[in-house]
């Protein structure tokens, strides 16, 4: 039950079991069917109010999905009826619990525990045992449904579902002063234990009884009753009854306001400090019945309850709960706040909820209120005009109901509240952008997954001795040493990291519970989890500057906080200040400064080498990435030499003066110039693949009037330019190369220039007159097909690729981590042998979608996290019906998704087999999606990518993932495995150049020549309809193949069979795979070491 027994942090999704995410996914498609019914609805009553008519007629797909979601998370009536019988039995037993006359509290506890069946769950600190504390037991005045149960509508959560019962303790049990020094909580614990013991004696093995810390506050135990009978197991949903002791308002509210002190036993000789957390806990206890009655009043409105169901799902998906070790705002607060906003007086305009709102409007209004700036900057009061309660400004956040004095945000830390508000605002943005399309991002996707949510995440393991602080009660009004340790650690890290992080979250996802014969205080969590959202603007700062020496107090505090790493430094402007300098020998060390700060500060202030024990979740992933991709985390800087060489290449060309036409434009057209190549030129190898550049002359009417003539003129221009470039001091060699020699109307030449900096650039000349001639040929039926191919090739090479390069450059410059993310993504695609089956441009846009498009998470500053999010997108993207839209510069029309969806529907109707556009991707520079994903990937490869992404994501989300397996593809699924003789490949030969000086002059005379790529192209040409080939161009040790399924089966002999076959019987033949392998060997020659045929009979 949200707020009582908190969900565990994505544990079910990590161990492979079914999660709400996978469970909900199965219903989304069915909602789409419902959408078609909405258009068929007719007006039932022409005389209805306009608002009602509009609501009926404009029932959106989003609202239909909400209705379906509510239906899915609601507990069915048959389950409730079965559970209600059990609850009535519990209530009868509670009222029959034996009376215990008033006696000394400690004697009563000892007597209750003497048979060792139960232990009274008392929290520290305990008052001196000679105090005259009295205890007694009489049955509760009432046993009634709690806040979640009073409406008889129950919602599922990750732990199943629950029924909360409020036990109203008679006022005679307490005195007017029992709110002081924890007396109320001790009597409450004794009272609950009496009931627990009676239930144990009467129910025996029928139930499992546990004490659970209410909201993880061990001062406030509640009793969890879990039925063990087969009848409940048959329901398929875990069911729990929670018994929650409560009282009516018996303590004066004025004594329990945030600025008051209510813990005095241990502060007798000290200044009495305010105890806001303790006071708020007491106020919550004595107002639960009041808030239950308020919620029950508004529960007659089904839209109110549905909005609570939506709130429950939204909170669960983000890991928000009422736990003081987590967020501090859960479903209980959601129910109460909704009821208060409907009933409170004196609220500013726009904050009042009206009864005529729909569930969706209730939900959105709640998020708008919770994200309000008023809650962060001021003391927000409800019912202030009807109360004389004087409430002073205390710690924020504060949202106080003046009728009760209860602060609804009292369990939240300010920084957690800021994070909570950011989540509210992010959800509102998703709703405003496209509520229907973003439905799954809001309600279905598990957001609280550290590998997907944070830039840096990990845990701090604690030893038992670190939670044994007998004096913790002198330092805080919190419930336990763990809560104090968590808060102190949070304050330390927040102060130490400062503006290097946008957000820091510390939490525990472990529910504090124990058997009724154990003590809750021995079951405190032994782990603190944390997550950081980094600030890219301050992340790489080397020096943290403190106060000047003139500020003696500030300087002393700075040195005490930082310890031996602090020092006085003089800066270039002449100023002197206390500072901390983080020495870094590489960009990777610089980006890891936050991790170094965490370890240092925890070691210094917590001792016991706590900092050294910190485990960063992505540490091993980062190590693996560095070994495969780059030793640097910020790979953006690795491209600085490439961009400098490009600028030199541009200047060298544009400064030429002896060419007939002046150059109008030079554009980058290569993955190396968009910071996204799988390997940086010259960074990992001694050679450089040619870097493509496109340039264009100013317009001229003297160009030939036919395509072949234009190509010959291009050759003449490039020969002249090559001659001029070779005369420059910074050019080693310039030559004109030919391509497309079998098709003279296509671009057939390029200029390849080797500069003295060893970078090779390949220039291609663009002439837009070619488009006119291609379109003219397209109008002729006899040349239409070839003209369409020629036009596509021209537009792709000279228009799309340069525009794509500029767009990706802009993304990478705005998000420096994009470079690492896209290189990781390419490594993943290549590792699974998908080279040439998915184009680099498609991969780059898949990663760009993580940064450009809205998602369940805010934009990350970590390449590794972005890669994980890309896998999440691929694992859940239904590319059959959902277009991918990349609006990189914001120029696409606002209804682009509607247009793209309609276009995709039309494409799928015309191409049912999905021969083209398996991935339908729209960008602002390719609005029709003709150049991205039109040919590649194919439908089969797209399905393969989805399967690989799901498997990889599942592995990544495990507690101890095997990162190597994510980038390793099994060879068992392939029919043919060709073992490549890697000694024949330049990329492996060149690794020896740095080892042997006599080989350093043997660098390749053909920059960029890749024998394995040419080999695979030749295989595709020879066996196009017989076998599909797969390889990894970054590490081509094997080439694999899969036979076309249609030729594997026996088939009747035909004279037009175009593949090797052997006779099975008189008129039946089958593929002769051995002959195919022999033909492959002949094509590969020395490149092939061996061929393994894995075709099963």
Swiss-Prot record:
Stretch list, region Disordered: 1-27
Biased composition (Basic and acidic residues): 1-10, 18-27
UniProt-annotated location(s): Nucleus, Nucleolus
Matching Pfam families: Nrap, Nrap_D2, Nrap_D3, Nrap_D4, Nrap_D5, Nrap_D6
GO BP: maturation of SSU-rRNA; rRNA processing; tRNA export from nucleus
Alphabetical UniProt keywords: Nucleus, Ribonucleoprotein, Ribosome biogenesis, RNA-binding, rRNA processing
Gene Ontology annotations for the cellular component aspect, listed alphabetically: CURI complex; nucleolus; nucleus; small-subunit processome; UTP-C complex
Predominant localisation class: nucleus
InterPro entries, alphabetized: NOL6/Upt22, Nrap_D1, Nrap_D2, Nrap_D3, Nrap_D4, Nrap_D5, Nrap_D6
Keyword Ribonucleoprotein on entry: yes
Transmembrane region(s): none
rRNA processing among keywords: yes
GO molecular function, a single term: snoRNA binding
Stated family: Belongs to the NRAP family.
Record note on quaternary structure: Component of the ribosomal small subunit (SSU) processome.
Function: Involved in nucleolar processing of pre-18S ribosomal RNA and ribosome assembly.
Protein name as annotated: U3 small nucleolar RNA-associated protein 22
């Amino acid at each position: 039950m949200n707020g009582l027994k908190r969900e565990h942090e994505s544990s079910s999704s990590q161990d492979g079991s079914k999660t709400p995410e996978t469970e909900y996914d199965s219903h989304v498609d069915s909602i789409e069917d419902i959408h078609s019914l909405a258009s068929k609805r007719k007006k039932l009553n022409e005389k209805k109010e306009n608002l009602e008519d509009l609501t009926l007629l404009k029932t959106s797909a989003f609202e239909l999905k909400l209705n379906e979601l509510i239906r899915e998370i609601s507990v069915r009536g048959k389950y409730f009826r079965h559970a209600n019988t059990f609850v009535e039995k519990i209530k009868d037993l509670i009222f029959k619990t034996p009376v215990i006359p008033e006696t000394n509290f400690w004697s009563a506890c000892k007597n209750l525990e003497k048979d060792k069946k139960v232990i009274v769950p008392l929290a520290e600190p305990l008052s001196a045992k000679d105090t005259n504390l009295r205890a007694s037991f009489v049955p509760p005045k009432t046993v009634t449904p709690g806040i979640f149960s009073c409406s008889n509508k129950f919602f599922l959560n990750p732990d199943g579902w629950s029924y909360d019962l409020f036990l109203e303790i008679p006022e005679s049990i307490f005195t007017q002063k029992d709110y002081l020094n924890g007396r109320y909580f001790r009597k409450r614990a004794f009272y609950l234990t009496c009931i627990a013991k009676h239930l144990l004696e009467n129910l025996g093995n029928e139930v499992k009884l546990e004490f659970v810390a209410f909201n993880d506050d061990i001062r406030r135990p509640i009793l969890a009753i879990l039925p063990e009978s087969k009848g409940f197991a048959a329901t398929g949903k875990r069911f729990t009854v929670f018994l929650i002791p409560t009282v009516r308002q018996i303590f004066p509210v004025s004594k329990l306001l945030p600025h008051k002190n209510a813990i005095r036993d241990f502060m007798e000789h000290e200044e009495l400090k305010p105890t806001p957390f303790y006071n708020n806990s007491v106020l919550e206890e004595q107002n639960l019945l009041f808030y239950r009655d308020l919620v029950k009043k508004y529960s007659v409105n089904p839209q109110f309850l549905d909005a609570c169901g939506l709130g429950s799902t939204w909170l669960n998906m983000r890991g928000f709960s009422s736990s003081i070790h987590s967020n501090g705002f859960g479903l209980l607060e959601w129910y109460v706040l909704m009821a208060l906003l409907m009933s409170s007086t004196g609220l500013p305009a726009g904050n009042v909820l009206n009864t005529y709102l729909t569930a969706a409007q209730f939900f959105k209004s709640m998020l708008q209120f919770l994200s309000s700036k008023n809650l962060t900057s001021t003391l927000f009061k409800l019912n202030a005009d009807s109360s004389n309660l004087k409430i002073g400004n205390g710690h924020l956040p504060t949202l106080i109901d003046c009728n009760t004095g209860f602060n609804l945000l009292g369990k939240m830390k300010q920084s957690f509240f800021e994070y909570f508000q950011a989540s509210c605002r992010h959800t509102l943005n998703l709703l405003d952008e496209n509520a229907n399309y973003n439905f799954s991002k809001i309600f279905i996707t598990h957001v609280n997954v550290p590998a997907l949510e944070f830039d840096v995440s990990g845990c701090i393991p604690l030893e038992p001795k670190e939670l044994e602080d007998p004096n913790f009660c002198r330092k805080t009004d919190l419930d336990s040493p763990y809560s104090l340790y968590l808060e102190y650690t949070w304050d330390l890290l927040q102060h130490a990291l400062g503006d290097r992080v946008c957000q820091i979250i510390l939490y525990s996802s472990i529910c504090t519970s124990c058997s009724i014969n154990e003590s809750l205080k021995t079951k405190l969590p032994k782990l603190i989890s944390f997550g950081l959202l980094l600030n890219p603007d301050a992340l790489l700062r080397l020096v943290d500057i403190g106060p000047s020496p003139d500020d003696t107090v500030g300087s002393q505090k700075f040195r005490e906080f930082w310890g031996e790493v602090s020092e006085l430094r003089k800066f270039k402007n002449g100023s002197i200040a206390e500072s901390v300098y983080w020495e870094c020998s590489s960009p990777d060390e610089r980006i890891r400064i936050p991790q170094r700060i965490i370890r240092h500060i925890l070691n210094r202030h917590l001792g016991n080498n706590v900092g050294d024990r910190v485990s960063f979740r992505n540490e091993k992933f980062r190590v693996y990435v560095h070994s495969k991709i780059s030793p640097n985390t910020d790979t953006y800087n690795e491209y600085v030499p490439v961009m400098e060489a490009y600028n030199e290449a541009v200047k060298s060309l544009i400064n030429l003066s002896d060419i007939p036409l002046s150059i109008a434009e030079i554009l980058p057209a290569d993955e190396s110039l968009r910071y996204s190549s799988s390997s940086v030129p010259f960074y990992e190898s001694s050679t450089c693949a040619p870097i493509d550049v496109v340039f264009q002359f100013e317009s001229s009417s003297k160009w030939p009037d036919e395509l072949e003539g234009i190509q010959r003129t291009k050759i003449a221009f490039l020969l002249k330019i090559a001659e001029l470039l070779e005369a420059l001091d910074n050019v080693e060699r310039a030559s004109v190369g030919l391509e497309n020699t079998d098709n003279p109307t296509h671009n057939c030449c390029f200029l390849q220039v080797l500069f003295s900096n060893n970078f090779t650039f390949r220039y291609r000349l663009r002439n837009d007159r070619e488009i006119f001639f291609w379109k003219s040929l397209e109008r002729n039926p006899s040349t239409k097909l070839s003209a369409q191919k020629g036009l596509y090739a021209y537009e792709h090479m000279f228009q799309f690729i340069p525009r794509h390069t500029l767009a990706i450059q802009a993304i990478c410059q705005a998000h420096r981590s994009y470079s690492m993310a896209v290189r990781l993504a390419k490594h993943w695609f290549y590792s699974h042998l998908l080279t040439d089956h998915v184009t680099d441009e498609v991969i780059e846009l898949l990663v760009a979608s993580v940064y450009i498009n809205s998602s369940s998470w805010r934009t990350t500053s970590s390449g590794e996290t972005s890669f994980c999010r890309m896998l999440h997108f691929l694992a859940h993207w239904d590319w059959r019906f959902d277009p991918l839209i990349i609006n990189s510069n914001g120029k696409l029309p606002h209804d682009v998704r509607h247009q793209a969806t309609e276009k995709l529907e039309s494409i799928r109707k015309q191409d049912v087999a999905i021969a083209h556009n398996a991935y339908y991707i729209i960008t602002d520079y390719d609005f029709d999606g003709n150049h991205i994903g039109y040919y590649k990937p194919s439908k089969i490869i797209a399905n393969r990518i989805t399967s690989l992404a799901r498997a990889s994501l599942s592995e990544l989300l495990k507690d101890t993932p095997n990162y190597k397996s994510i980038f390793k593809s099994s060879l068992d699924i392939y029919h043919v495995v060709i073992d490549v003789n890697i000694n024949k490949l330049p990329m492996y030969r060149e690794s020896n150049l740095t080892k042997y000086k006599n080989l350093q002059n043997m660098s390749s005379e053909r920059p960029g020549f890749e024998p394995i790529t040419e080999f695979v192209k030749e295989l595709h040409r020879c066996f196009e309809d017989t076998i599909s080939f797969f390889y990894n161009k970054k590490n081509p040790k094997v080439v694999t193949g899969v036979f076309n399924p249609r030729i594997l089966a026996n088939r009747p002999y035909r004279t037009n069979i175009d593949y090797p076959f052997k006779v099975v019987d008189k008129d039946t033949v089958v593929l002769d795979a051995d002959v195919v392998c022999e033909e492959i060997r002949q094509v590969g020659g020395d490149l092939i070491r061996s061929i393994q045929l894995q075709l099963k009979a």
